[in-house]
Amino acid sequence: MPTLKGIPVVTSGMKVERDGVRAIKDGVKHNPRAEAAPRGRKPSWLRARVPSGEGYQAVRDIVRTHRLSTVCEESHCPNIGECWNAGTATIMLMGAVCTRACRFCAVDTGNPKGRLDHDEPAHAADSVRLMGLSYVVLTSVDRDDLEDGGAGHYAACVNAIREVNPETAVEVLTPDFNGVPEHVHRVVDARPEVFAQNVETVRRLTHPVRDPRAGYEQTLEVLRLAKARRPDMLTKTSLMLGLGERDEEIRETLEDLRAVGVDIVTFGQYLQPTRNHLPVERYVSPAEFADYRRMGLEMGFLEVVAGPMVRSSYRADKVLEKNNVGLESAS
């Protein structure tokens, strides 16, 4: 089996081509657990509307025109209709093919072999201008094929957006850059308002939930490095619930995050994107999400956004308002 920096790359599954890069569709190989996974109707609180409306169409047209990838589309986000109708979008940088294959994620996996759109910073800046955004979230696939993991490209995109849209606040939701301090610092030095790196799940479930190249401690270190570099910058992370985590593990994770100075946490329900991804172990109720939010606020986080349909970028602009306090729990 081929390897990328010593780690096997998924080679089985439906092969597709994305902008000249061969990839495995949805980023996963056959999952034997899927055959035994419980099936049933989702709870009523998890039913999202079919995306439609003039705002949704306008944002979609801009994304197509400027050849942008959005995490909204690539991750099958259930909030795409609500967010795009509000004229906001999370831009996914560096293409639509990820070098990693996390068991929860529907993004295609492959080896882009160093391909990078050097016009993307200008395209992203112009798209922010066209959409009239006051707040933009930049995220990306993992790019272990690049020497700096894409840190320089992130910085270039932030700088381009700043030049064209000086009033726009920027959040970056980055890869872990393999924990290399210089790469983390390069992004932080571009001075985004918010730096985010997702821990995704509790320590015990990190593997098999995340790709072997990712790690619980590595994410904590990236968040620590970012905060230490710029103490005035907000740091943020996100957890999916419903993968088999226990309450005491959630509390332990929150304690670990506070210890490295994280300011904002989001909680959302894990939803299985295809039958080959990890099955949902349970559906967490809105009342339980409210309890987790209270737990986090009592531990000193500036804000905790928690709800079944919450994703890491959901209502991100609202969290920055009013000194990051006063946001109602999302259900």
Swiss-Prot record:
Classification via SMART domains: Elp3
Requisite cofactors: [4Fe-4S] cluster
One GO MF term: metal ion binding
User: EC number(s) for this protein?
Assistant: 2.8.1.8
The UniProt record gives the binding positions of [4Fe-4S] cluster 2 as C98, C102, C105
Sorted alphabetically, which keywords does the UniProt record give?
A: 4Fe-4S, Cytoplasm, Iron, Iron-sulfur, Metal-binding, S-adenosyl-L-methionine, Transferase
Pfam families in UniProt: LIAS_N, Radical_SAM
Q: Name one GO cellular component term.
A: cytoplasm
- Residues reported to bind [4Fe-4S] cluster 1: C72, C77, C83, S313
Q: Does the keyword Lipid biosynthesis apply?
A: no
**Pathway listed:** Protein modification; protein lipoylation via endogenous pathway; protein N(6)-(lipoyl)lysine from octanoyl-[acyl-carrier-protein]: step 2/2
State the free-text cofactor note: Binds 2 [4Fe-4S] clusters per subunit. One cluster is coordinated with 3 cysteines and an exchangeable S-adenosyl-L-methionine.
**Where does the record say this protein resides?**
Cytoplasm
Main localization (coarse): cytoplasm
Per its UniProt entry, which superkingdom is the organism in? Bacteria
Q: Which reaction does it catalyse?
A: [[Fe-S] cluster scaffold protein carrying a second [4Fe-4S](2+) cluster] + N(6)-octanoyl-L-lysyl-[protein] + 2 oxidized [2Fe-2S]-[ferredoxin] + 2 S-adenosyl-L-methionine + 4 H(+) = [[Fe-S] cluster scaffold protein] + N(6)-[(R)-dihydrolipoyl]-L-lysyl-[protein] + 4 Fe(3+) + 2 hydrogen sulfide + 2 5'-deoxyadenosine + 2 L-methionine + 2 reduced [2Fe-2S]-[ferredoxin]
Domain named Radical SAM core is located at 84-302
Sorted alphabetically, which CDD domains does this protein's record hold? Radical_SAM
Q: Which InterPro entries match?
A: Aldolase_TIM, Elp3/MiaA/NifB-like_rSAM, LIAS_N, Lipoyl_synth, rSAM
Stated family: Belongs to the radical SAM superfamily. Lipoyl synthase family.
For this entry, the protein name equals Lipoyl synthase
Native organism is Alkalilimnicola ehrlichii (strain ATCC BAA-1101 / DSM 17681 / MLHE-1)
- Source lineage: Bacteria, Pseudomonadati, Pseudomonadota, Gammaproteobacteria, Chromatiales
